[in-house]
């Protein structure tokens, strides 16, 4: 949930070491966060697939991957860091 300042009240961070395969963890973590905030997964479209694909790509390059999940009043945002890159993927909440 967002405060009036637009800053997320809560952030969840998932750290995935390069030495282990990513598996479904990024997608499952997002699904859990959506459930906690009572957000219908269909409201954020293909966000879960995009997060999963990018995390796997970064991990397969031999990099640790850090995934930050944030829920705002108007969007769900995910930031991925790894492989020397930082990517932000978001979807509006309907």
Language-model segments: residues:
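Helix-loop-beta hinge of the Bergerat
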Residues: 7-41
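Conserved ATP-binding N-box helix of the HATPase_c
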Residues: 41-66
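Conserved beta-strand-loop-beta-strand hairpin that lines the nucleotide-binding pocket
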Residues: 1-13, 57-94
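Residues in flexible loops and secondary-structure boundaries
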Residues: 22-24, 28, 47, 77, ...
């Amino acid at each position: 949930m967002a405060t009036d300042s637009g800053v997320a009240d809560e952030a969840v961070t998932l750290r995935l070491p390069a030495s282990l395969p990513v598996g479904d963890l990024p997608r499952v973590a997002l699904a859990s966060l959506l459930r906690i905030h009572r957000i219908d997964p269909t409201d954020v479209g293909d966000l879960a697939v995009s997060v999963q694909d990018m995390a796997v790509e970064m991990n397969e390059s031999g990099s640790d991957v850090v995934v930050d999940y944030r829920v705002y009043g108007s969007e769900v945002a995910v930031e991925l860091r790894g492989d020397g890159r930082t990517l932000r993927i978001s979807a509006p909440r309907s």
